[in-house]
Curated annotation (Swiss-Prot):
Residues 19-212 form the Glutamine amidotransferase type-1 domain. Coiled coil: none annotated. The keyword rRNA processing does not apply. CDD domains: GATase1_GMP_Synthase, GMP_synthase_C. The active site is at 96 (nucleophile), 186, 188. Keywords: ATP-binding, Glutamine amidotransferase, GMP biosynthesis, Ligase, Nucleotide-binding, Purine biosynthesis. This is GMP synthase [glutamine-hydrolyzing]. It comes from Streptococcus thermophilus (strain ATCC BAA-250 / LMG 18311). It catalyses: XMP + L-glutamine + ATP + H2O = GMP + L-glutamate + AMP + diphosphate + 2 H(+). NCBIfam families: guaA_Cterm (TIGR00884), guaA_Nterm (TIGR00888), PRK00074.1 (NF000848). Residues 213-402 form the GMPS ATP-PPase domain.
């Protein structure tokens, strides 16, 4: 019988913590709004647009932000809002679709896309037409990112115009008596030059935030909630060798001690020497109770002949839980499975309002007959926040700054069918890449880096002989939160050294290419 996910971060229980909630209307990047607010030291989290006024009262936020989204307020299936929320006396900021929704519900007028020729996509110059607390400290003209088809043509009673642009007569509006604000652009993205200032003004000047949220608060909150949720029952944690599951392990140990059993599944898709390193770091240094399971044959047999990336993820996710079932059957009274799911995993796997980019191993690969309830203590955090959490928990840099590693392991860094030969090329080339990046002192500057077996063979010459071997791609990116990323501009001499070493030291490889694609349009991983 399937059991439901346990939502570990329920901010309605944080009675002593100020929070600003963001209502989700479907933008793939609306969680960045919550992230920006958190950067100011104010707790924030995405909530469904279906939230009721009573639920908002229970959460007791100091502010509400209505996010952007792709819908029109005139669509039959348009996302709405419980209008009683407008009567709660809580400051509201509507962004893009959020501004249009605010206008539509409060008696203004929104013109559908194309009717007035007022579409705006890309950077635009915003012109302030009135003084506003929301724009305090920003210039009269500023560059913002617009992304809208529909537009406001009449603002509701009680509001006044704050800013416009060449193609948008009402780019910002406010009703200072009710503390309602609307902006047609996106302050959460870095293309809006003064976006952080605008969000900060809303949080502090308008909502009265104190900025006293910290990772220490998060640790205390999660430990308390884990203890309340788990009680005297037992938890299994799957260790993948990555940062996320390692941080979850230390957090759970602090919360419930020996009620935690960690299962480290060696699925045969790990990096070079990873299995022994996991046991030494987490079992030895931190004293976690770890059961190591060699299930490599089970996984590799199931993956034989499979080249579709989604099928790979599903197979690995399913088998991972089945291995857990097998191991859990040997233990008594285990009710929970803990995972290192991050906020970015949840968003990319699709929410109620946003489409799926790809299924994540911690989100979309679980079978319907799973026998555990899920505990996901990190599912409101971004990767850099997980590192900060690890530091707060006293974990050393060698663990906290370990390269991110997906649950499916090297399976999604091998294009096409997985073979032992391909696995070995990725293991060895990845080890060389990590070693040379560290030698160059770039391991803190480059957010993530790894190698990929592209599955492409090409002709080469080594010695006096012709070769026909694999092409290895190097992927290295810079990022802040993993939601957007640029390819890392690695020094040529470093790339050259990496390339020379790989083709000379790794069998069956004769060509190296460098991935210079940003995210978007690409994702970080190749599959």
């Amino acid at each position: 019988m399937q059991k439901e996910r346990v939502i570990m971060t329920n901010i309605s229980t944080l009675n002593d913590v100020q929070k600003i909630i963001v209502l989700d209307y479907g933008s793939q990047y609306n969680q960045l709004i919550a992230r920006r607010i958190r950067e100011f030291g104010v707790f924030s989290e995405l909530k469904s647009h279906k939230i009721t006024a009573d639920e908002v009262r229970a959460i007791n936020p100091i502010g509400i932000i209505l996010s952007g989204g792709p819908n029109s307020v005139y669509a039959e299936d348009a996302f709405g809002i419980d209008e009683e929320i407008f009567e709660l006396g809580i400051p509201i900021l509507g962004i893009c679709y959020g501004m249009q929704l605010l206008t539509h519900k409060l008696g203004g007028k929104v013109v559908p896309a194309g009717e007035a020729g007022n579409r705006e996509y890309g950077q635009s110059t915003l012109r302030l037409r009135a003084q506003s607390e929301l724009f305090a400290g920003t210039p009269e003209e500023q560059v913002v990112l617009m992304s809208h088809g529909d537009a406001v043509t009449e603002i509701p009673e009680g509001f006044h115009l704050v800013a416009d642009s060449v193609d948008c007569p009402f780019a910002a509006m406010e009703d200072t008596k009710k503390n309602f604000y609307g902006i047609q652009f996106h302050p959460e993205v870095r293309h809006t030059v003064y976006g952080n200032d605008i969000l900060k003004n809303f949080a502090f000047s308008i909502c009265g935030a104190k900025g006293d949220w910290s990772m220490a608060n998060f640790v205390d909150m999660q430990i308390a909630q884990i203890r309340e949720t788990v009680g005297d029952r037992k938890v299994l944690l799957g260790l993948s060798g990555g940062v996320d599951s390692s941080v979850v392990g230390v957090l759970l140990q602090k919360a419930i001690g020996d009620q935690l059993t960690c299962i480290f599944v060696d699925h045969g898709l790990l990096r070079k020497g990873e299995g022994d390193q996991v046991m030494e770091m987490l079992g030895g240094k931190f004293g976690l109770n770890i059961i190591r399971v060699d299930a490599s044959k089970r996984f590799l047999d199931l993956l034989a002949g499979v080249d579709d990336p989604e099928k790979k993820r599903k197979i690995i996710g399913n088998e991972f839980v089945h291995v857990f079932d097998d191991e859990a059957s040997k233990l008594k009274g285990v009710d929970f499975l803990a995972q290192g799911t991050l906020y970015t995993d949840i968003i990319e796997s699709g929410t109620e309002t946003a489409q799926t980019i790809k299924s994540h191993h911690n989100v979309g690969g679980l079978p319907e007959d799973m026998q555990f309830e899920l505990i996901e203590p990190l599912n409101t955090l971004f990767k850099d926040e997980v590192r900060a959490l690890g530091t707060e928990l006293g974990m050393p840099d060698e663990v906290v700054w370990r390269q991110p590693f997906p649950g499916p392991g090297l399976a999604i860094r091998i294009m096409g069918e997985i073979t032992e030969e391909k696995l070995e090329t990725v293991r060895e080339s990845d080890a060389i890449l990590r070693e040379e990046i560290a030698k160059a002192g770039l391991d803190r500057d480059v957010w993530q880096y790894f190698t990929v077996n592209t599955g492409v063979r090409s002709v080469g010459v080594m010695g006096d002989g012709r070769t026909y071997d694999y092409t290895i791609a190097i992927r290295a990116i810079t990022s802040i939160d993993g939601m957007t990323a640029d390819f890392a501009k690695l020094p040529w001499e470093v790339l050259q050294k990496i390339s020379v070493r790989i083709v000379n030291e790794v069998d069956h490889v004769n060509r190296i290419v460098y991935d210079i694609t940003s995210k978007p349009p690409a994702t970080v991983e190749w599959e």
